[in-house]
Amino acid sequence: MSAPASTTQATGSTTSTTTKTAGATPATASGLFTIPDGDFFSTARAVVASDAVATNEDLSEIEAVWKDMKVPTDTMAQAAWDLVRHCADVGSSAQTEMIDTGPYSNGISRARLAAAIKEVCTLRQFCMKYAPVVWNWMLTNNSPPANWQAQGFKPEHKFAAFDFFNGVTNPAAIMPKEGLIRPPSEAEMNAAQTAAFVKITKARAQSNDFASLDAAVTRGRITGTTTAEAVVTLPPP
């Protein structure tokens, strides 16, 4: 914090010296020194963006590519929602293999749709953009992600068992007209964060960080750390 300007005056002297702090705001504030007032905060409009979510520009690029691939314009949104719903079942990482062909893409496989997306942004960023749509879709049909049990989720948290769950409440995502059917509960958010932590920990345990391949160092292990050694403190249940 900048200290206020100080004024000193020698005893018996009529001359005063004013010392200004380097970071002090000029008396006449304009340009980048303009001080905002209440009107600004009540009328200003901010464009929400997140580096975890595909941008509108990204979607425009993907839309153009899909048009060239002959994805029907009138069902293109549904093709996107179907792909993202599929990713809620199988995952949205770069290594995920898409299965089959959705009903809205004119026979174009989900794998080809995903490949086109990856030329513009990550598959997870794309899925994050539509996370609220998929959340409502799953709740409406009482159809949680297919692998919720395999991921260790409890039945009461099963709708949070997908790896782009954070997009449900991200303001940069596309929100259905009626909003969320219900917001995620604190327990669901905690379960999703815990699952993400466990997945990262397991992946770290599979990596090899040995500086030497000598058996005295590796002890015969291929990976550098066991899962048990990699796990630190998990969040409370």
Swiss-Prot record:
<keyword id="KW-1139">Helical capsid protein</keyword>
<keyword id="KW-0687">Ribonucleoprotein</keyword>
<dbReference type="Pfam" id="PF00286">
    <property type="entry name" value="Flexi_CP"/>
</dbReference>
<keyword id="KW-0167">Capsid protein</keyword>
<dbReference type="InterPro" id="IPR000052">
    <property type="entry name" value="Pltvir_coat"/>
</dbReference>
<protein>
    <recommendedName>
        <fullName>Coat protein</fullName>
    </recommendedName>
</protein>
<dbReference type="GO" id="GO:0005198">
    <property type="term" value="F:structural molecule activity"/>
</dbReference>
<dbReference type="GO" id="GO:1990904">
    <property type="term" value="C:ribonucleoprotein complex"/>
</dbReference>
<dbReference type="GO" id="GO:0019029">
    <property type="term" value="C:helical viral capsid"/>
</dbReference>
<keyword id="KW-0946">Virion</keyword>
<comment type="function">
    <text>Required for genome encapsidation. Forms ribonucleoprotein complexes along with TGB1 helicase and viral RNA.</text>
</comment>
<feature type="region of interest" description="Disordered">
    <location>
        <begin position="1"/>
        <end position="28"/>
    </location>
</feature>
<comment type="similarity">
    <text>Belongs to the potexvirus capsid protein family.</text>
</comment>
